[in-house]
Regions:
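Active-site entrance/lid segments in N-terminal catalytic domains of soluble metabolic enzymes
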Residues: 1-202
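Conserved active-site-proximal phosphate/metal-binding subdomains
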Residues: 174-208, 213-343
């Protein structure tokens, strides 16, 4: 079986960066360059996702839709309350009212799966958890390839057992949320290429891989390790078409103030790699595993930081290759990364 991301002229996938970063314009530019585009379905209702998918259909016949698969983590209410209390002075300083009663949601997952079954697309990928065999079967029945994001060999084995068609292997150096099915585990640093080799030794499925990509050489390393395509997110954050906020863009280009990244649960309650700023330094130690409750708790603060242009309170998602992100058209960036590996 040939997976959709194996058919594009260039073996580059534009990462589905939820929350407005992966815009329709960014996806279109990735497709125009010969890469594989995604519609980022995270944080959207089915009604909001629908027009983005239909717009993508007008741009490219080959594309994917990414969803957040529910992965409930038992909430430690006392730890949550301690974190909320620690945030109160900062919230008061910025005139923000915190959502101190824990909010739970499934990101409209069932409704989005229902919509994708009724309006089939070439490929659907899942992150944050593995799809159930039932969901795999429903999407297969309408001709959709199902891809699971995995971060360990164990997750890869389980995904294969559930019948997925391919894997996206996310290394620990990737920016933004880890797609791990176990967000409570400690995520150890390692090259993504090593993880790809380990998984391919155990699982016979096509693989796309990403995490820590800082240029064309890194793309080549992942392809040499056995990946069919390479997922790029951080290197597209400064693209003209990306929805990256102004303070996020400024921080990415300020190597003196924002020189390192780290995995933190402080913004959302789920491990995510970000540029280390004041918020991370102050609250990482008291943060807890409680997604989406912490996401909702800090949402108002992050919105205020974005509106006021303050990068020190903002979730500055970035992988370890962030220093090599440059402004320009996404089409040019994708071609620079993938042209030498054209199929």
């Amino acid at each position: 079986m040939t997976i959709a991301f194996e058919t594009t002229p260039l073996p580059i996938i534009g990462a589905p960066m939820a929350g407005g970063t992966t815009t329709p314009e960014l996806s279109a530019a990735v497709a125009a360059a010969g890469g594989f585009p995604f519609v980022a379905g995270g944080y959207l209702t089915a009604e909001a996702l629908a027009p983005l998918v239909e717009r993508m259909r007008e741009t490219s016949e080959t594309f994917g839709v990414n969803l957040f698969a529910p992965n409930p983590v038992p909430l430690d209410r006392a730890a949550f309350d301690r974190f909320a209390t620690a945030l109160e002075p900062l919230a008061a300083e910025h005139g923000v009212t915190l959502e101190t009663e824990p909010v739970d949601d499934d990101d409209h997952y069932d409704a989005k799966v229902d919509w994708l079954v009724a309006h089939p697309v070439p490929l659907v990928s899942m992150t944050f958890n593995l799809p159930t065999a039932e969901v795999v079967d429903r999407l297969h029945a309408v001709g959709t390839h199902l891809v699971a994001t995995v971060t360990t060999v164990g997750e890869a084995r389980e995904a294969a057992a559930r019948g997925v068609d391919a894997l996206i292997v996310q290394g620990p150096r990737a920016g933004g949320h880890s797609g791990t099915a176990d967000p409570t585990r400690e995520i150890e640093d390692r090259p993504t290429a090593d993880l790809v080799r380990e998984i391919l030794a155990e699982v016979d499925l096509p693989i796309a891989a990403g995490g820590g990509v800082d240029g064309a050489e890194a793309v080549g390393e992942l392809l040499d390790a056995g990946a069919s395509a390479v997922v790029v997110g951080t290197l597209l954050l400064l693209a003209d078409e990306a929805g990256t906020s102004a303070p996020h863009r400024a921080a990415l280009q300020d190597a003196e103030k924002y020189s390192e990244t780290g995995l933190t649960r402080a913004f959302t309650g789920r491990p995510a790699r970000a540029l280390v700023n004041d918020f991370v330094r102050e609250f990482d130690e008291v943060a807890l595993d409680a997604y989406p409750a912490v996401h909702h708790l800090t949402k108002g603060l992050r919105a205020e930081a974005k509106a006021s242009g303050d990068p020190n309170l903002l979730h500055l998602w970035a992988g370890t290759g962030h220093r090599w992100a440059v402004p320009g058209s996404a089409e040019t960036i994708v071609k620079q990364l993938g042209t030498r590996f054209a199929r």
